[in-house]
């Protein structure tokens, strides 16, 4: 592959293992000029024999930073995610694309609602950091199989409090006071049906379809935007 201006050279600065599936990667990217919350970039791996593999990942970092971060979920037989999780080291070189996509960006005209499953929280990490800096309100609903999958749980719980709703569906820790059920209409009883919202949903295809079904029954004044794994 001959790279165009679409891709830039990048150096891995930091790698943080979260659990047996998730990790954060932070890169320094040449000519990085920031992004709009909700955009993604493509990460390219190049083998010694010239073989290349490219995968898209939502940008999880604050838009104003001169570095860019991604939340990586290790997928069974995932060519890129397995390498990034298992073998990448600080100092490694990659190619990372300029920010892509305007379909799932933060509009911030009405009150945002973020609905995520698992690593689908990634674009909302960027969006929420931006909104917190602007001191603007938003709601976050996050479903995870375990406590470690609730990325930034302590920070969210401290800062957002009544606007943050975490759910654990499998490995429920002792003393857990959050939700334990899968997504249903009752989870959103705290929303004011007379207020306008912009709703963002990110997760697996089955989760997004279920969330759309639930939201459609709430009769909210809202615009809905979706992002699905692999789409």
What are these regions (language model features)?
Residues 2-90, 145-146:
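Ferredoxin-reductase
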């Amino acid at each position: 592959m001959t790279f165009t201006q679409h891709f830039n050279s990048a150096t891995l600065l930091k790698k943080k293992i979260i659990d047996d599936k998730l990790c954060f990667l932070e890169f320094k990217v040449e000519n990085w000029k920031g992004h709009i919350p909700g955009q993604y970039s493509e990460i390219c791996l190049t083998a010694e024999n010239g073989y290349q593999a490219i995968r898209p990942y939502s940008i999880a970092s604050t838009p104003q930073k001169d570095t860019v971060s991604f939340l990586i979920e290790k997928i069974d037989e995932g060519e890129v995610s397995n390498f990034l999780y298992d073998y990448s080291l600080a100092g490694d070189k990659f190619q990372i694309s300029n920010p892509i996509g305007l379909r799932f960006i933060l509009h911030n005209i009405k009150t945002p609602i973020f609905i995520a499953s698992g690593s689908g929280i990634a674009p909302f990490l960027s969006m929420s950091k931006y909104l917190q800096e602007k001191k603007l309100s938003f709601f976050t609903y996050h479903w995870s199989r375990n406590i470690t999958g609730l990325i930034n749980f302590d920070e969210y719980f401290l800062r957002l409090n009544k606007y943050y709703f975490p759910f654990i569906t499998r490995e429920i820790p002792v003393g857990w006071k959050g939700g334990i059920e899968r997504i249903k209409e009752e989870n959103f009883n705290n929303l004011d049906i007379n207020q306008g919202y912009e709703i963002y949903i990110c997760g697996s295809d089955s989760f997004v379809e279920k969330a759309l079904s639930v939201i459609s029954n709430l009769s909210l004044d809202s615009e809905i935007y979706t992002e699905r794994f692999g789409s």
